[in-house]
Amino acid sequence: MGKIIFYEDRNFQGRSYECMSDCSDITTYMSRCQSCRVESGCFMVYERPNFMGMQFFLRRGEYHDMQRMMSMGMMFDSIRSCRYPYRAFRMRIYEREYFGGQMSELMGDCDSIMDRFRMSDCMYCHVMDGHWLMYEQAHYRGKMMYLRPGEYRSFRDMGMSGMRFMSMRRITDMC
């Protein structure tokens, strides 16, 4: 299990809150978060409560100025622990929402669905095993989304409207 400590001010100053699991609304514990330390594990922070909106992946390390790092002053309101001891990874991706278009199956990282599968987009997926990060651009760049086992029928319904995913990576021991 991971451990993260949030601080109200930059450079690890002000009130702090220690977290070791998911938190759907961090404003319950503190009014703002300007810096944090990830002591172990990996975490995904979300810009809105209940794990909605833009996401940012944090691994072990120190983040002394969260607003600068996350760009445009984005604040976050919820956090989810991402470290899970999976050995098997399997996901099906679809070109269109609701099982539409071309389908491809992944068991490992994919730095470009266009190059590997000749797919122009990924709008739906079914994660059967493991935990994954999906990226807006090829080569693991741009906005990202954290996926656990389950069906993701429409990214638009998850607050990710207009997002196109072009690469995906397994969450392994990289934390």
From Swiss-Prot:
Pfam families: Crystall (PF00030). It comes from the Eukaryota. Keywords: Eye lens protein, Repeat. Residues 2-40, 41-86, 89-121, 130-172 form the Beta/gamma crystallin 'Greek key' domain. Transmembrane segments: none annotated. SMART domains: XTALbg. One of its GO terms (biological process) is visual perception. InterPro entries: Beta/Gamma-Crystallin, Beta/gamma_crystallin, G_crystallin-like. GO terms for molecular function: structural constituent of eye lens. Has a two-domain beta-structure, folded into four very similar Greek key motifs. Belongs to the beta/gamma-crystallin family. Monomer. Crystallins are the dominant structural components of the vertebrate eye lens. This is Gamma-crystallin M1. It comes from Chiloscyllium indicum (Slender bamboo shark).
